Amino acid sequence: MNSLMSQSRRVMDKTEFLAAIKLVSGEELLSMVTSVHDENGDYLIVENPIEVEEVMLPNKQAGAKVQPWMKFSREEQFVIPKDKIITIVEVTEEVAVFYHMSLRKLNTDF
């Protein structure tokens, strides 16, 4: 367990990176994140977060549904207190490609 905590701490100490985030609400996000620790507390600044949800396709395969995390806002950055985060990991290159492709599609749809 200690190695998991130290791995999470290393990820959280990076300046800015593309992450998969699981919130206590159950939401799963992909976003560029910056970890902040200052007099206001510990929090993440998420930039262009998208919510990802697993869905079953008609052919019985799993697919992904993506949507803006904050559907009624044109803001690009949001603050999430770290106590609202279950876990956070840096994504693979394949997920990064999926994120950027999804973000481009969402930006043209809205």
PLM features: what roles do these ranges have?
Residues 2-110:
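Conserved RNA-binding domains used in RNP assembly and mRNA/RNA metabolism
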